[in-house]
Amino acid sequence: MNPDQPITELFTQPNCQPCKQVERKLNEYGIPYIVHDISTDENARERVRALGYTQTPVVLASDGTSFSGLHLGKIRALRND
């Protein structure tokens, strides 16, 4: 991973099928990302709440925009972020 490349953040939790689908798409499109498990990371859980979300997956793009759920168009758009 290039340290100068913007990083997308993916907030997940165990047994979340949409989370796994989003992660597969990020990998498929070659989008660099880091994963935060909100079930074990209180800071990540608070960040998700602060963004206004109550469920996972939550994707936080490097430009500060975010979305929840499996939105293929939004995920594809991250390739150009």
Regions found by a protein language model. Name each.
Residues E46-L51, R76-N80:
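Short amphipathic alpha-helix with an adjacent loop that forms part of the alpha/beta core around
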Residues M1-Y29:
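Local sequence-structure signature of Cys/Sec-based thiol-disulfide redox active-site neighborhoods
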Residues P3-D4, E46-R49, S68-G69:
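Short secondary-structure transition/capping segments
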Residues A61-D81:
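Non-catalytic, surface beta->alpha helical segment in thiol-disulfide oxidoreductase systems
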Residues I7-E9, P32-I34, G64-T65:
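Short active-site oxyanion
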Residues R49-V59:
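Structural micro-motif
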Residues I31-A44, Q55:
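Thiol-based oxidoreductase modules, predominantly thioredoxin-like and allied folds used
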Residues Q13, Y53, L72:
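ATP/adenylate-binding site constellation spanning eukaryotic-like Ser/Thr protein kinases
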